Amino acid sequence: MLPGAARSPCLRFPRRFAHGGLAAPRTALWATAWYGIHSKAFTSANSPLRKDASKEPALASNSKTTNPIPTQASASVNPPKDARNATTAKKDLLSETTLANKEQRKADWAIIKEMAKYLWPKDDWGTKLRVGTALSLLVGAKILNVEVPFYFKSIVDSMNIDFATVGGTAYTVAGSMIIAYGVTRIGATLFQELRNAVFASVAQKAIRRVARNVFEHLLRLDLNFHLSRQTGGLTRAIDRGTKGISFLLTSMVFHVVPTALEISLVCGILTYQYGFQFAAITAATMVAYTAFTITTTAWRTKFRKQANAADNRGATVAVDSLINYEAVKYFNNEQYQVARYDKALKAYEDASIKVTTSLAFLNSGQNMIFSSALAAMMYLAANGVANGNLTVGDLVMVNQLVFQLSVPLNFLGSVYRELRQSLLDMETLFNLQKVNVNIKEKPDAKPLQLHKGGEIRFENVTFGYHPDRPILKNASFTIPAGQKFAIVGPSGCGKSTILRLLFRFYDVQEGRILIDDQDVRDVSLESLRKAIGVVPQDTPLFNDTIAHNIRYGRIDATDEEVHKAAQRARIDALIQKLPEGYQTAVGERGMMISGGEKQRLAISRLILKDPELLFFDEATSALDTYTEQALLQNINSILKEKKRTSVFVAHRLRTIYDSDQILVLKDGRVAEMGSHRELLDLNGIYAELWNAQEMSLAQDLEFERETERDDVESKERDMAPGPKAQQ
């Protein structure tokens, strides 16, 4: 049995309990002590979590959290209008809302204009040269394509003789035309393939730049945005959007303009060679074909949007289920998750069927229009041959020219359909780039200078995730430089919010936060966040090796520095025992290692970063008592050695009783502040909480002593000799 001084005062309460595969901190004792001290119960008025989020599935409603983070239901639906940090009202990027035709066209043109910047960048002459070369090759290919029917006409007319009477061979009669015909077709194909090869790097470079810009923008967005988004659906939408970039660029350069050029050439040739009737039929066909295609495709757009939205929902359910695999298993909800996924698949199936059937209608209408035009032109040409005005070669040439149009026309129809699809897929991608970055640094922001050693001062700070539910209310306190500072209080009182405000995940609504007399809003974000190190309550780990996760604290750290950081966090010995050592994979979100190991990896990462300001948010809640005490001793030695300003957020008072200053929060206000001894002498909230935890510890010790006595007595009875048998 461990000595009483080393034991946790919370042993009677569960250290952690399973929730979604994560280890939750022990907050039950705080709630018990707090309710026992005060007659009126604490409500969750300060908590940003909505109580009425009952429209979510039952599994979600069973889970509770004490972390004051706005949920999607609250943060994105009712954001504060007057808070600089709050997310402004915005439409759901993954929704299936169908815009009016005028609005949709406006959105499409905005995307096309944006992509034109990547197609013809101002300062990239290499890209401009490639685009210009590709366009030249394209024009050459189209001209050669239009020349092919002329050679075919000449071949037919040349061969329309009586060889028995005239004599000669096919080579002597039409040899040059046949060679020209073959060379022209080969040249057109060669130009097209060269065009594709030249333009390939332009499209791929644009995809990379757009994807990089979107990803960079996502990382700049505030915490509230990421907490309210559906990761699975968002990643699926981004993936579709990036795939649509290549098609959009190719369509802009190689399909829309070239098809218009080819149609103009054919109409001009028909008018010049055969009269206005042929050109009129061609022009009318183009107008009818284009109008029918655009109208029908616009009608089909809503079906594609519904399919995309269902696809996003399915991806969201799948990703959430796999990430929270343990929660699904703990509550035997496999069939529930399968039913949710199948519901999204059914919606996608229904929308896809509508897409396919409407596509059949579109294709049928296009073929009817074109076939009618072809029949009309063939009649005119045949009538001209019958009247002696045209030759058989002219009939063949008209047929060839019309069929020459069929390829770009049919292709234009499919291109327009795919173009609309690409624009829809890219709409989410470009809407992401329009989401405002709420936390910005000033143009004249300067690097943070810690000339006083890292003194932190909150001056009349008021903040709430929602206007009607403030978390901090006119809070003022100072964290002296180089001291160990602790923040305690009930769940939802704003302890973790203090860290988020200091780190500038959010900005205060009133008051200001100073570090060495510098407002955090006046310094650069990079220097501010570089100076702060955090061990969060829920340790974020990447699906990579242990070494990578520790080195994430300082990317350029050597292996030796990584090992030293792990030693100081008392996890090196454990890592060395693993078969693959530091190259052991931790799994998705670190699920392959225990909660205590995750927290020690987080502390290793913090030690490696070596920042001036340290924050520990229940950093040892998942550790056993012995490891916790040993690790705290190491942390305290580091703090004393380097004289770092450190802040500990804790529920178990025995882990922070040696702090230089302890701040007690109540209802978002500073209730008490002082050293452990001063707060006990004050005989206020802190003293009552301490006594409640000590009483719990005493009860634990008495219970264990009674258990041990019972065990000893039981063993003695078992070993005592029984009554002698009668002789």
From Swiss-Prot:
Q: Might you give the EC number(s) for this enzyme?
A: 7.-.-.-
Q: Where are the transmembrane segments?
A: 131-152, 176-199, 249-272, 274-294, 361-379, 395-416
Per UniProt, the ranges with Basic and acidic residues bias are: 81-94, 702-719
Domain of life here? Eukaryota
What are the annotated GO cellular component locations?
mitochondrial inner membrane
Question: Mitochondrial intermembrane side of the membrane: what ranges?
Answer: 153-175, 273, 380-394
Q: What residues bind ATP, as annotated?
A: 465, 489-500
Segments of skewed composition (Polar residues)? 60-77
Query: Gene3D superfamilies annotated for this entry?
Result: ABC transporter type 1, transmembrane domain, P-loop containing nucleotide triphosphate hydrolases
The entry assigns this protein to a family as follows:
Belongs to the ABC transporter superfamily. ABCB family. Heavy Metal importer (TC 3.A.1.210) subfamily.
Protein name, as recorded: Iron-sulfur clusters transporter atm1, mitochondrial
Organism this protein belongs to: Aspergillus fumigatus (strain ATCC MYA-4609 / CBS 101355 / FGSC A1100 / Af293) (Neosartorya fumigata)
